[in-house]
Regions:
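Secreted/extracellular ectodomain signature
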Residues: 16-126
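C-terminal motif of bacterial Sec signal peptides marking the signal peptidase cleavage site
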Residues: 11-14
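Sec-dependent signal peptide recognition
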Residues: 1-8
Length: 126
């Protein structure tokens, strides 16, 4: 009886969609940059095909590094990042302070180093 049951459901097991490579290639959908103060910047990024929240956080960090360099400064300090996912679209709302010198704090980034790492990983900056 068990064997008959397995035989009848076996054809339906093949109906599961097989993941394709395209589902694992990040699709970076853009960055919105808002200057909140002279050295305080908010970044809103969105992407699909992220494997985890860390992917969209990295995208926001790359945007912050690129923006910092565009402003002619060299460093940024991460203040906060809120991540959300809805219907496969990941978003991050991140705030950084930017500065010409290394700021105080534990979550600081050297914009040149981070931008180079982003380029190596194929993550766009601003």
């Amino acid at each position: 009886m068990k064997a008959a049951w397995l035989i009848t459901i076996a054809p339906f097991a093949a109906c599961e969609p097989v993941p394709t490579a395209e589902r694992f290639i990040p699709d970076y959908r853009g960055v919105e940059t808002m200057l909140l103060d002279d050295d305080l910047v908010q970044f809103r990024v969105s992407m699909t095909n992220a494997l985890s929240a860390r992917d969209v956080e990295n995208y926001a960090e790359c945007a912050a590094a690129g923006y910092t360099l565009i402003r002619g400064w060299g460093f940024a300090r991460h203040l906060r990042t809120n991540v959300d996912e809805e219907a496969g679209v990941w978003t991050a709302d991140a705030v950084y302070t930017i500065s010409p010198a290394l700021p105080r704090g534990i979550r600081t980034i050297d914009a040149e180093v981070v931008s180079a790492a982003c380029a190596e990983k194929g993550i766009p900056t601003v």
